[in-house]
Amino acid sequence: MKNATFYLLDNDTTVDGLSAVEQLVCEIAAERWRSGKRVLIACEDEKQAYRLDEALWARPAESFVPHNLAGEGPRGGAPVEIAWPQKRSSSRRDILISLRTSFADFATAFTEVVDFVPYEDSLKQLARERYKAYRVAGFNLNTATWK
């Protein structure tokens, strides 16, 4: 069964240039990697991808997350790959963490997807539309908050 989890954000605080959603993406990617999963982070654009790349490199050594931008890194990619619409590898991944504002048609290739319901009202409507699209695509839907 395919599962999609939507994390509900209760703030829109920016820290070190990262939105609340982007901060959470880094934490979830780290957690999923530590549990042995290969992760694809699908960014909205190249600028966001580079921002997340820098944030993951800036983590303390004890919480380092091996990652690369799509098309870079070792053969087959690092355990966590950061992509955007114009740049995505075909390397197999266990989990999709989607930062896309619209439903990513390639999401159906994953058995686990992480998405977000941002704090901003204008973005909540887009999240509702993605939620409906995942349901139509046959995903089991869940909502969660981060610890």
UniProtKB/Swiss-Prot annotation:
Alphabetical list of InterPro entries matching this protein: DNA_pol3_chi (IPR007459), PolIII_chi_sf (IPR036768)
Record annotation: effect of changing residue 117 to F: Cannot fully complement the AZT sensitivity of the knockout mutant
Catalyzed reactions per annotation: DNA(n) + a 2'-deoxyribonucleoside 5'-triphosphate = DNA(n+1) + diphosphate
Effect on the protein of changing residue 20 to D: Cannot complement the AZT sensitivity of a knockout mutant
Effect of deleting the gene: Knockout mutants are sensitive to high levels of chain-terminating nucleoside analog 3' azidothymidine (AZT).
Phenotype upon changing residue 128 to A: Cannot fully complement the AZT sensitivity of the knockout mutant
GO biological process: DNA replication; DNA-templated DNA replication; positive regulation of DNA-templated DNA replication initiation; response to radiation
Effect on the protein of changing residue 131 to L: Cannot fully complement the AZT sensitivity of the knockout mutant
Entry similarity comment: Belongs to the DNA polymerase III chi/HolC chain family.
An example molecular function term from Gene Ontology annotations: DNA binding
Name assigned to this protein: DNA polymerase III subunit chi
Keyword Nucleotidyltransferase: yes
Role of this protein: Part of the beta sliding clamp loading complex, which hydrolyzes ATP to load the beta clamp onto primed DNA to form the DNA replication pre-initiation complex. DNA polymerase III is a complex, multichain enzyme responsible for most of the replicative synthesis in bacteria. This DNA polymerase also exhibits 3' to 5' exonuclease activity. Genetically identified as involved in the repair of replication forks and tolerance of the chain-terminating nucleoside analog 3' AZT. This subunit may stabilize YoaA and/or stimulate the helicase activity of YoaA.
GO cellular component assignments: DNA polymerase III complex; DNA polymerase III, clamp loader complex; replisome
Quaternary structure, from the entry: The DNA polymerase III holoenzyme complex contains at least 10 different subunits organized into 3 functionally essential subassemblies: the Pol III core, the beta sliding clamp processivity factor and the clamp-loading complex. The Pol III core (subunits alpha, epsilon and theta) contains the polymerase and the 3'-5' exonuclease proofreading activities. The polymerase is tethered to the template via the dimeric beta sliding clamp processivity factor.
E.C. designation(s): 2.7.7.7
Keywords for this protein: DNA replication, DNA-directed DNA polymerase, Nucleotidyltransferase, Transferase
